[in-house]
UniProtKB/Swiss-Prot annotation:
Keywords: Carbohydrate metabolism, Disulfide bond, Glycosidase, Hydrolase, Polysaccharide degradation, Secreted, Signal, Xylan degradation. Endo-1,4-beta-xylanase involved in the hydrolysis of xylan, a major structural heterogeneous polysaccharide found in plant biomass representing the second most abundant polysaccharide in the biosphere, after cellulose. The keyword Amino-acid biosynthesis does not apply. This is Endo-1,4-beta-xylanase C. The gene is xynC. The keyword Repeat does not apply. Optimum pH is 4.5.
Amino acid sequence: MFKFSASLAALAALVPFVAAQSPEWGQCGGIGWTGPTTCVAGTTCVESNPYYSQCLPGAASVAPPPPSGTSSAGGSTPSSSAKLHTLAKAAGKLYFGTATDNNELTDTAYTAILDDNTMFGQITPANSMKWDATEPQQGVFTFSGGDQIATLAKTNGMLLRGHNCVWYNQLPSWVSSGSFTAAQLTSIIQNHCSTLVTHYKGQVYAWDVVNEPFNDDGTWRTDVFYNTLGTSYVQIALEAARAADPNAKLYINEYNIEFAGAKATSLLNLVKSLKAADVPLDGIGFQCHLIVGEFSGPGLQTQLSTFAAQGVEVAITELDIRMTLPSTPALLAQQQTDYNSVITACMNVESCIGVTVWDWTDKYSWVPNTFSGQGAACPWDQNFVKKPAFNGIAAGFSA
């Protein structure tokens, strides 16, 4: 058996304290935080709100103020009994909502939570209003899937977001593989948008009229719409939607615009040109499909403000924050911080009207089937148990 000298024992005792530092962008404090409260060299522990502090690039490493038991607004620490839509409304936002899909609505344990309109005040149909679901054959429309979710929203007193009119993906082959003149495709877009939006007239708060028009490098996607009509297809779709339902808000919805870059710049320039030409456009949707630990809340806030300055409202439309599996306590804690950062960014921008998660439970998340080895992206786990992320959301609305 080895015997440690007094000096070695003292050195060993110091090791945990040396190692117990949060990495850059890691959490370093806040109400309920039990992890490290100092940051690695070159970063500073900055308090964003009483519920979390984060190691941001800077010159010094300092500990955050000791957490108190109340929020800055005087409320108590959010608990798992919090109702997110109720909190969002109390904070001055229009809604907290979720996407859902028709196949999920046969799961009674799922719908028992989904139907709670104090938890979710808004619903987005994930797939049943897309082109392949609504006009699978030219001129032949079917609305059964969308109607089911629209009825659910009406029954529960929830806002409904329409998703979507024009998108490069999930198109029936007669559209995606068609060979059209500009006049023909213009008529096809007008008929599809008009028929779809008219069918749900008076039921939909906002439509994602155009979805994901740009590549990540800021160039336009080369799909049947752009290849045939150039950029004018956006105006065609927006004008058709406005004529069909003058009271619905009209959005362009995009991902990877949560930070400054070529894609965000291209979309911003499009917004400016559309507004200058008096083309109807009311909002920009920030999808926010994010990765744990790779996200800047202040960066998102800046982007929300930049777009809002163009005279449009903004919304978080498809929020989830994925991680490399398996999940760990550290990853779940960081995910809590990241969800809180998104809510805080929206809270700090008056024109950010609400937040929608892209389904609320890991059981029905799209992430594992799209990103190999990743998942656990939602605020509830696959057994419908609230994760730390839930409290991150609640704290953001309560701050």
